[in-house]
Amino acid sequence: MNSANWMTGESTLRSSAQETQAARVEPSAADEQGMAAWLPDWMVRRLSRWNLPAPLALAMITLALMGAILSPLFAASGRLGLLIPGAILGVAGVVIVAKWRILGLIALPIASLMVRFAIGTGSQTGINAAVILLCLLLGLWLLDMIARERQIRLLTYRPVVASLVFGVVAIAAFGFGQLPWYATRSAALPAQFGGLLIFLLSAGAFLLIAHQIRDISELKWLVWVFLAVGLVFFTFRLFPPSYRLMTRIFVRQGVLGAAFYIWLVGLALGQALYNRQLARGWRILAGILVLMVFYVNMRGDGRFWISGWLPSLFVVVTICLLGRPDLGVFAIGLGALVLLLNPQVLSGLTSEGDNAYSTVTRLEAWRIIAELVKVNPAFGLGMSNYYWYTPLFPILGYRISFNSHNNYVDIVAQTGLVGLLVFLWFVAELWRLGWHMLSRVPEGFPRAYVIGALGGLVGTVVLAGLGDWVIPFFYNIGLEGFRASMFVFLFLGGLVAIARLYGIDPGRRDEAQPG
């Protein structure tokens, strides 16, 4: 072969090799482009401003670290073999929820009420599926703001501001809880962190829905899924032979939480009475669900458990008064007549069952906790600590640890009078916003939701006085109780979401008209 032919042959070989290499590279590049197209841009884009890797890489690193930290717990419980499949499912869940955020939102009721999975913490409570999913959604929202919007921007609605202040007060109270207020042991640090987590997740659930609902249809999906799960559960409750199957499907700590009932009643009754755009059959079914809740919770000895039905009764009266004042006045008059003719009904609230003993012990517990808090009335004793201080003051002659069974007393004991005032401010601002929205939101689902949420807010205020149902106390209902209490803050966040979607703000004179 002469030099010319040799050079030509070499050129041909090089060209062929380059084409082959290109042919090998092109599919992987196309695959990479397709993967990037399937994922949100902000997940695969490097955070150059902070010199950090892409959020997806950060999420995988975080999962790896969590796996390393939690592996001893899995090994101790004999579940080490679940760690790798769990990590794979976790990464897949992160990707899916990041792409379709609405799937994560509507999965919250299902995870809360039907998914038993929980990560053990070595204490009396574990990190359940509802907490994990909510933390994932909050983390993705935060990463979205950092990576895509390049700033953390929150709504300026007063309830949003109040919820943020409440979180700050809880963190400050946690700091005060590290001080030795009494010459005895305080709560273990994991228990204090658990108590703080409940406070912060409550505010986080509210902020998440307020900001992440992007269209009224997404809120509809969240409500319909919640009501559907509730309907299935109470259908089981109507038929005792099905209880064994029911206990396999539903998580006891979720479906027996009283907050679950008041929001079922509030949202279902609001849609049944005032959403005239909803088909009549669905409205009737929503009304039947309300009747089922009252029937199941008041039959037999259930009437002794007033947390199961009394707050829901306040929800019904409030919804009737807001939407149909004449109907509300009639309901109140009818109820007053029943009480006049049957005064034993009212006295039975505190005397039937174990209510008499419960009333006496609770009043004494509140008196003792008031004495304990005197050392720091402004910010309280910190998260979960008062439970270990109570034996210093005998209750009915016994030196035992106890909790208050009252959210207002709990808030004062853990975050002081400052925490209670901020919580009441949060509630007042929500009522003010909802009242302002009544005449400004469109008919149909939005207005029915606002009325139902205001009814739920009143029921929540009543319920908080009957137990730690709204912000669970770590040593009583605990993180497992957050499965139900989360709904309070999710659906109150929906109230702010509707205000945002329709441009309603009591602080502005020139509001956007509902479209």
Model-based region annotation:
Residues M145-R153, A210-L222, N275-A279, R324-L327, ...:
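Membrane-interface junctions at the ends of membrane-embedded or membrane-associated helices
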Residues L349-R367, F379-T415, H436-V441:
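Long extracytoplasmic/lumenal interhelical loops at the membrane interface
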Residues G78-L83, T125-N128, A191-F199, I249-L264, ...:
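Membrane-interface micro-motifs in multi-pass membrane enzymes
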Residues G266, F314, G456-G515:
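Transmembrane alpha-helices of multi-pass inner-membrane enzymes
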Residues N2-A68, I88-G93, L164-G175, F199-L208, ...:
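Alpha-helical transmembrane segments of multi-pass inner-membrane proteins
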Residues L417-V461:
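Hydrophobic transmembrane alpha-helices and their immediate junctions
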